[in-house]
């Protein structure tokens, strides 16, 4: 499993990308 912090950043970036689109 990846570093939880990196996982959170990845999910946040994904969410932000969907929200901005």
UniProtKB/Swiss-Prot annotation:
Signal peptide (residue range): none
Key word Secreted present = yes
Sites bearing Serine amide, chain numbering: 21
Expressing tissues: Expressed by the venom gland.
Choose one Gene Ontology CC annotation of this protein and give it: extracellular region
An annotated Gene Ontology molecular function: toxin activity
Q: Where in the cell is it found?
A: Secreted
Secreted as a keyword of this entry, yes or no, is yes
Write the record's keywords in alphabetical order, separated by commas: Amidation, Secreted, Toxin
The family assignment reads: Belongs to the cationic peptide 04 (cupiennin) family. 09 subfamily.
Instruction: State the protein's name.
Output: Cupiennin-6e
């Amino acid at each position: 499993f990846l570093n939880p912090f990196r996982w959170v950043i990845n999910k946040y970036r994904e969410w932000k990308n969907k929200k901005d689109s």
